[in-house]
Amino acid sequence: MPSLNEIRSTFLDYFGKADHAVTPSAPLVPQNDPTLLFVNAGMVPFKNVFTGAETPAHPRAASSQKCVRAGGKHNDLDNVGYTARHHTFFEMLGNFSFGDYFKEQAILHAWTLLTAEFKLPKDKLLVTVYHTDDEAADLWKKIAGLGDDRIIRIPTSDNFWSMGDTGPCGPCSEIFFDHGPHIAGGPPGSPDEDGDRFIEIWNLVFMQFEQLAGGERISLPKPSIDTGMGLERIAAVLQGQHDNYDIDLFKALIAASVELTGVKAEGAQAPSHRVIADHLRSSSFLLADGVSPSNEGRGYVLRRIMRRAMRHAYLLGASEPLMHRLAPTLVREMGQAYPELRRAEALIVETLRQEEERFRTTLGRGMGLLDEATANLAAGGVLDGETAFKLYDTYGFPLDLTQDAVRAKGLTVDTDAFDAAMQKQREMARANWAGSGQQGAAAAWFSIKEKAGATDFVGYETTETTGVVKAIVVDGAEVESASAGQTVEVLLDRTSFYAESGGQAGDTGVIEAHGRESRVLDTQKQAGELHVHRVELASDLKVGDQVVASVDADRRNTTRSNHSAAHLVHAALHHVLGPHVAQKGQMVDGERMRFDFSHGGPLTAEELDRIEAEVNEVIRQNVPAETKEMAPQEAIEAGAVALFGEKYGDSVRVLTLGKSLADEAKAYSVELCGGTHVARTGDIALFKIVSEQGVAAGVRRIEALTGEAARRFLLDQAGVAKALADQFKTPVAEVATRVDALIADRKRLEKELAEAKKQLALGGGGAASGPEDVNGTALIARVLDGVGGKELRGVAEEFKKQLASGVVALVGTSDGKAAVTVAVTADLTGKFSAADLAKAAVIAMGGQGAGGKADFAQGGAPDDSKAEEGLAAVKALLAG
């Protein structure tokens, strides 16, 4: 019985021998489609090839693509754990032809692989074709020898695929496996096709038409093939299972869950173990591909998945965080096929642990609220949307988690009321997911790239070069020429200008043409390989002009220093904090370095000092930086750090900086990076951290300066310290102690002043004048000059003690504003509300209202001259 890993290898090996380029899985975050939340099909990484926007590197390809369906249009989250074949994460095996072979060879490959390589019984297979696709039906008869009874014609869109309202489209042919008559269900197209007897295992898409906007459908000059076979589905068939969760991978994950929880995967507990196993896969792969749990976009979907699994761990009685202890089992099972899992194991374990610990603090209380809210609901009842919203807002329960929780009781949630209560949060959760760094290059640039080819970047060697204008773009449209005064985008055949990428800002400088220098405001990367200059033209410019492009060398040098320092910081963070640290983003330019990284809490002063000291020690080594071109896998196996979720080409640039502080024979920092960097570590000169802060849950940010900017910062700090020392007439080393003493003195004096004001207020009119009687109610009403809201509370409490029964109304005036405090003794709260009395006083004084309870309330007003009017309003209410 083949393992899942062996099945994947057999598929890829077969197509590799059939002259297909075996392509590694793309990251789960789409690189070329900002409209997609996650890669959800095998063809997504090839979308621009199918649309003609990109030229394929090879006319045939095959892959096992990581996919996630847990958000947006394609969302399987609710069903996971309760069905045999729903997953949030799955692998899609696929073979692709880009204008090369078509239907006959696609059908031949599929039939050969299934029957000759996988040795599936031919009589267990049947196929569907689009009802008008006679060609496909005839080919199935010719190649597989299938009769008409096993070639089912389907007239619906299930067997016709399209990319959208317009674009490539074509009929499909789906291959089904018959699990046998002992399982209920009929063949596709029959009334009982939804049964589980006949399971689709492979879909062949014959992309032969183009759908035009007017409704017309024309034939493509070079039809293509896109196929998809779910690895988990074919593994179940080949391992003699009817349920995906019974294949070897899930058996291992579920066994680990059973061992750690002590609860068997049987009966009502089985879905929980399945959810945990499935969600562990999607969570771990998303983390490995650079997604972090957050409250928006992709990060929020990840958090939903993680928390759903954590609730099921809670249902199984797990008393301690569970998910992070299962991660090593997943890495053992899938790490060979996906090395990024191994590289990210420390990050995965730490993030899962932190997220579960954070959620467990509210999970129990939230479940208690849910149990209380559903206690009196009968099966078929509806949980009110307000409670569901409270669970979300207060306890961190995503809506689908609440729905999952009440499902076991036969209940549903009033989602309309929930949506109305949390529209703002819902928008944040569902919208604003950005694409990758390129955010889907405009079609115009892909067209230009086809004509002009990739930019020849020579910026590693020089900051000045001569080039020829290959394209000019104005407001998104390609033009032949542009006039002085316009701001345009200019493409040269070769350039020394670095285009913004990997967090490094694009170069600025000048382009000289016709004896005039035009300012280059920015340089951006388009269509993957084009360095596009945004230029403020000082002279006319046309395609074909020869120009001299000169980078702002000073800005380039400071940017290089900041970028190299960021690499050193990354290495130092690993040494000081641990291997779980992963880069989450960076921005380096001519001003400073900003580095975002995964870590669970604020860094201590000692940790920051150690990081800063390490980086400066490597700078002082003043050793040459080394760069080398290598294959990505070769570089990673050699120890180079790759960014999680980044997709690399066939060759990568490997940058080595400094010597290890523990072993000089080893390097301090080795990373894959295409940016510009210093020639020697000593060129950085000096490194100084200026801030460290949190930017999201589990993500911290360090900002730092290098070189002259760092020196000026330290001089400024020294100047401030010297000025304070002169002011305090104390040595610089003792300034901090002196400031601490002054702060302590101020707090003590403020406390003494508040007490003095309180005593003055009480002594200035308390017992001597006594309360007045207002319609039978004792009232102490005072205007207290110079007393703020904080002091008023204590004064009101003291006055209240003097009354057996009554009301205290105080207005404190300070800096032209007024503070109102009202207190009511317990016996009168049924008759008078302090909140109502305070509100009346504040409104009479020109304010908006007050807050509080029946026995005590406070508010504020903008005009202290109306203090007596405020007290009069209180008296009026008491008088009835």
Swiss-Prot record:
The family database entries (PANTHER family) matched by this protein are listed as:
ALANINE--TRNA LIGASE, CYTOPLASMIC, ALANYL-TRNA SYNTHETASE
Q: Which source organism?
A: Caulobacter vibrioides (strain ATCC 19089 / CIP 103742 / CB 15) (Caulobacter crescentus)
Q: What cofactor is this protein dependent on?
A: Zn(2+)
Give the domain note: Consists of three domains; the N-terminal catalytic domain, the editing domain and the C-terminal C-Ala domain. The editing domain removes incorrectly charged amino acids, while the C-Ala domain, along with tRNA(Ala), serves as a bridge to cooperatively bring together the editing and aminoacylation centers thus stimulating deacylation of misacylated tRNAs.
User: Listed disulfide bonds for this chain?
Assistant: none
- Source taxon at top rank: Bacteria
- Free-text comment on the cofactor: Binds 1 zinc ion per subunit.
Keywords annotated in UniProt: Aminoacyl-tRNA synthetase, ATP-binding, Cytoplasm, Ligase, Metal-binding, Nucleotide-binding, Protein biosynthesis, RNA-binding, tRNA-binding, Zinc
Q: What is its subcellular localisation?
A: Cytoplasm
tRNA-binding in keyword set:
yes
Q: What is this protein called?
A: Alanine--tRNA ligase
List positions binding Zn(2+): H563, H567, C673, H677
Enzymatic class: ligase
Q: Among the entry's GO cellular component annotations, what is one?
A: cytosol
Q: Give the family, as the similarity comment puts it.
A: Belongs to the class-II aminoacyl-tRNA synthetase family.
Q: Provide the reaction this enzyme catalyses.
A: tRNA(Ala) + L-alanine + ATP = L-alanyl-tRNA(Ala) + AMP + diphosphate
Q: What is its main location?
A: cytoplasm
What this chain does, per the record? Catalyzes the attachment of alanine to tRNA(Ala) in a two-step reaction: alanine is first activated by ATP to form Ala-AMP and then transferred to the acceptor end of tRNA(Ala). Also edits incorrectly charged Ser-tRNA(Ala) and Gly-tRNA(Ala) via its editing domain.
Return one GO MF term.
alanine-tRNA ligase activity
